[in-house]
């Protein structure tokens, strides 16, 4: 279903009541979206694979050779997300490049100028070109390798994005198509109500201090950064200064 220029929603199965967009109260910026071009989507609904079972829902979305993907919200361990397994799951202290983060999102951008939002609030898994269907691994000839080189020859990355949503029996997939990545992202923002420009320092460089730093140690770090002319717009204070942290014991009457 076309929702606006460059914005399409495909509904598969029975979407859950609670999801990223279904639980939000927002008004799309339709006037601004109407002023934009209406580019052709990179792929059709028929090219999206969908299946569901007692375990949940699986989607497959096209991915062309050379296409690079970015996104999935805050990712502390990597920038480009092509050829990876991403678990969209909240985690305050991710230790590996698995997709866990403080603010993950079931959303990715492509260098082909489109973005995809899989509207789910569950811990979904995305395989971004790192998996292949068994019937496509060997290619057209499907010949069994006869030596070490043939058996372990690189067959290239997968040609699809696989999405697994546990327990769900369906979901909405939003496709935002633009002239380039920036334009696709703009359509996503406008459709979700538009963004607010934060103060410029909020877009600056953030330095977070060690958990057990005291006020004196934090002040010392700030002075050293300034003395060395190192740019820093924000200092993050970890909750070690609380009486107890996680969950914290912040008490207003002490300040």
Predicted regions and their residues:
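Aromatic-lined carbohydrate-binding/catalytic grooves of carbohydrate-active enzymes
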Residues: 193-255
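Catalytic and substrate-binding clefts that recognize carbohydrates or anionic sugar/phosphate headgroups
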Residues: 1-199, 209-211, 215-216, 222-227
């Amino acid at each position: 279903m076309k929702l606006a220029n460059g914005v399409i929603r495909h509904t598969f199965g029975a979407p859950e009541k609670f999801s990223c967009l279904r639980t939000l109260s927002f008004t799309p910026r339709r006037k601004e979206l109407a002023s934009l071009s209406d580019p052709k989507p990179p792929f059709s609904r028929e090219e999206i694979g969908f299946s569901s079972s007692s375990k949940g829902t699986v989607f497959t979305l096209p991915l062309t050779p050379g296409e690079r993907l970015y996104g999935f919200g805050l990712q502390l361990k990597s920038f480009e997300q092509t050829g990876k397994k991403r678990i969209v799951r909240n985690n305050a202290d991710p230790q590996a490049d698995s997709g866990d983060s403080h603010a993950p999102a079931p959303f990715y951008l492509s260098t082909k100028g489109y973005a995809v939002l899989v509207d789910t609030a569950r811990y979904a898994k995305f395989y971004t070109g790192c998996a292949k269907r068994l019937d496509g691994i060997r290619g057209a000839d499907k010949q069994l390798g006869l030596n070490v080189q043939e058996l372990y020859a690189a067959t290239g990355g997968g040609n699809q994005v696989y999405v697994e949503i546990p327990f769900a029996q369906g979901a909405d997939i939003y496709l935002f198509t633009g002239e380039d990545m920036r334009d696709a992202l703009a359509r996503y923002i406008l459709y979700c109500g538009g963004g607010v420009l934060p103060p410029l320092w909020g877009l600056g460089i953030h330095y977070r201090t060690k958990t057990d730093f005291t006020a004196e140690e934090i002040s010392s770090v700030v002075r050293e950064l300034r003395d060395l002319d190192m740019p820093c717009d924000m200092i993050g204070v970890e909750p070690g200064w609380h009486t107890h942290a996680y969950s914290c014991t912040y008490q207003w009457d002490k300040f």
